[in-house]
Regions:
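Catalytic alpha-helical scaffold of carbohydrate-active enzymes acting on polysaccharides/glycoconjugates
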Residues: 1-174
Length: 174
């Protein structure tokens, strides 16, 4: 083994978005830089969007001035008429959602979809499209690239019960 140089860096990518294949992999290959891609295996090959990307798409594309969203036991009115309003509202909603179980988070996402009237899909927001298994396989032929498991569905492990957390971790490796 060689010692790690003082100026060493690790190049990593999180989640498994398609731009890892269409943009990053080509650039990294051209300049000979290795990278590790941590992919959310349950999303690969689907047209699904991560919950956070669904929220961003709904609120960013909304033409409404405000929406009513139930965060826990509190129904709140969020201003979404201006760019600043959208950013502020997204920050509050995302922060709340990061600290709750997936089932409750899914209800909030459905609430936001209903309130905004925007039905998010990866065709609306190409930056949110996830890799296909074919793209992963192609990248995996490059010796510069390695892959690691993120988890299956990108849920916050600390808000899952033990069995759910184990499935998220082991399922992403299998």
């Amino acid at each position: 083994k060689r010692p790690i140089p003082a100026n060493a860096v690790a190049v990593t990518f999180d989640d498994g978005f398609t731009n890892n294949f269409t943009d990053a992999a080509q650039i990294l290959d051209d300049i000979g830089v290795p990278a590790t891609f941590y992919i959310t295996t349950g999303m690969i090959g689907t047209n699904q969007m991560f919950w956070v990307d669904q929220l961003e798409t709904c609120i960013n594309l909304s033409t409404k001035k405000n929406i009513e969203v139930c965060l826990g036991d509190n129904r709140q009115i969020f201003q979404v008429g201006s760019y600043k309003d959208k950013v502020n509202s997204l920050n509050v909603i995302k922060t709340f959602c990061k600290n709750i179980h997936k089932d409750k988070k899914d209800l909030i996402v459905e609430n936001v979809i209903s309130e905004t009237g925007v039905f998010p899909n990866s065709k609306q927001s190409l930056n949110y499209r996830v890799l296909t298994w074919n793209e992963v396989k192609q990248m995996n032929t490059n010796p510069l690239f390695s892959f690691g498991g993120h988890n299956v569905t990108h849920d916050t492990l600390s808000y899952l019960n033990h069995d759910e957390a184990v499935e998220q971790i082991s399922g992403s490796i299998n």
